From Swiss-Prot:
GO molecular function ontology, one term from the record: 4 iron, 4 sulfur cluster binding
Originating species: Escherichia coli (strain K12)
Cofactor(s), names only, from the UniProt record: [4Fe-4S] cluster
Entry binding sites for [4Fe-4S] cluster 4: 186, 189, 192, 196
Phenotype of gene-disrupted mutants: Deletion of both napG and napH genes has little effect on the overall rate of nitrate reduction during growth in the glycerol/nitrate medium. However, during growth in the glucose/nitrate medium, the double mutant shows a decreased rate of electron transfer that correlates with decreased NapAB activity.
GO terms for cellular component: periplasmic space; plasma membrane
Disulphide-bonded residues: none
NCBIfam families: mauM_napG (TIGR00397), PRK09476.1 (NF007012)
Keyword ATP-binding: no
UniProt keyword terms in alphabetical order: 4Fe-4S, Electron transport, Iron, Iron-sulfur, Metal-binding, Periplasm, Repeat, Signal, Transport
Name of the protein in its database record: Ferredoxin-type protein NapG
Positions of [4Fe-4S] cluster 2 binding: 99, 102, 107, 111
């Protein structure tokens, strides 16, 4: 074999290895992408009670899993690469197993890093997310039927979820009892989503960053105390 053939064979092997590596990485990327899409479709991932804001949480969490072990209801899971969250961090899916709102909040009390606020005194102060009625068109109560399951299952009934009466314009004779979520009381436990009788729940618990807007600091409301009458 001539000397000139050796470099050519080396280049061919190099290019072949590059193509194989690129193909392998692309396949892994596609697989992870599909897994993440499946994970998102199966339900929204929520953080445990007492979790600090998401960016700080991902940095503070040491992935020890103690909160998962402390949960007596197997609500909490640890995220994988396919979960759409930082791997090793705790989460739960309300449609699968909602938070049972333990009074002693064991998951937060064992957190060693501060990712979960151990100083939280009442589970009623937790804000794991916010229940949002995402599908009024299919909600049975909005159709004029009496369902009320989400309302009756809510651990803060008549506080976090109330039923508001509205005249049924379709019949002209009856009232509709419309479930209404109050963000100042909702803990985001997810029990309402869990018990929704529809194939896909009409009410879902979303992270606060998705469920609520954010008011700019330049807005002032004159009717609120401390604004000196300015609007």
């Amino acid at each position: 074999m001539s000397r000139s053939a050796k470099p050519q064979n080396g280049r061919r092997r190099f290019l072949r290895d590059v193509v194989r590596t690129a193909g392998g990485l692309a396949a892994v990327g596609v697989a992870l992408g599909l897994q993440q899409q499946t994970a998102r479709a199966s339900g929204v991932r929520l953080r445990p009670p007492g979790a600090i804001n998401e960016n700080a949480f991902a940095s503070a969490c040491v992935r020890c899993g103690q909160c998962v072990q402390a949960c007596p209801y197997d609500t909490l899971k640890l995220a994988t690469l396919a979960s759409g969250l930082s791997a090793g961090t705790p989460y739960f899916v309300a449609r699968d197993i909602p938070c049972e709102m333990c009074e002693d909040i064991p998951c937060a009390k064992v957190c060693p890093s501060g990712a979960l606020d151990r100083e939280i005194e009442s589970i009623d102060d937790a804000r794991m997310g916010l229940a949002v009625l995402v599908d009024q068109e299919n909600c049975l109560n909005f159709q004029g039927l009496r369902c009320d399951v989400c309302y009756r299952e809510c651990p803060k009934i008549d506080e976090a979820i109330t039923l508001e009466l509205e005249r049924n314009t379709r019949t002209g004779k009856h009232a509709r009892f419309l479930p209404t979520v109050h963000s100042d009381a909702c803990t985001g436990c997810g029990k309402c989503e869990k018990v929704c009788v529809l194939e896909q729940p009409a009410i879902k618990v979303l992270p606060l960053s998705l469920a609520k807007g954010e008011l700019g600091h330049h807005y002032r409301f004159g009717w609120l105390e401390g604004n000196n009458g300015k609007s």
